[in-house]
Amino acid sequence: MQELDARAKSLLAALKADSRSGATQLALNTLDQLLSYLDEVEPEGETFLRLLAELRAARPSMIVIGNALAMIEQRLSSDVQVALQAVMDIRDQLENATGTIARQALDLLPESPVILTHSASSAVLALFRNMAEQRQAFSVICTQSSPGFEGHSLARALNELAIPVTLITDAQMGLFVPQADLVITGCDTWLSNGHFINKSGTHLLALAAHAAGKPLWVLADSFRNSDADPGSVELEEMPAEELNAPPGDWITPRNIYFERVPHALVSKRISELGVFSCPAEPRR
């Protein structure tokens, strides 16, 4: 099998090491790096196919990356220019899907909503930017999302938009859900049984929202659809060192980054294809 060159290995390592970016942003970053790689290295077809295969397997909990790369692979030929165009086209489709989701969600929001979110979804941030551009009054409650603290980057982005944001620890989700009008999260993978995978803590947030009678909207484009058996999906575990656990022979720190969230707790799924009611949608 063709050995990966140093540039390809670096690209693969960067994808594996990024534990801060959301699925969409990580996919876009990877596609941008692929464009540079194709343009500057002009790899042989076998090398590029192997790189795509290894990239697809690198982040199993973020199916959007694997789906985007699979779509590129379907269009490949021996011509580097064809590969470049395929990457650019898929990148545009992914970026446009995020914008469409934001517009779909915007039309459904109540007046002056208080929105609670967890982690730092690109789709959720796109919605917030859209709301700010439309000068719609709203405020946000966001978790800091430990151990990566990507909620801090979301809080900074909202601050730059002059949007009021309350930053809380993940442990305070149950306290603050009653103060929100609705909960909105992103999604890393939408499973065939309707459950979805997202940053750990999302399941607890969904349970808190359900208990408080607050709707849970999931922003999930079609790139996140997975046909895999839900029971076989790998939930990525990151280095335990991120937890800064005390040393001890009887201490075992665990750092599982993603979890499944039951379909029954979801009120709406909003994708670029439309708005889909789910089991937790309030009956009228």
Predicted regions mapped to residue ranges:
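Gly/Ser/Thr-rich loops at beta-strand to alpha-helix junctions
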Residues: 24, 114-124, 147
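Non-catalytic, soluble scaffold/interaction modules
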Residues: 50-77, 89-94, 98, 103, ...
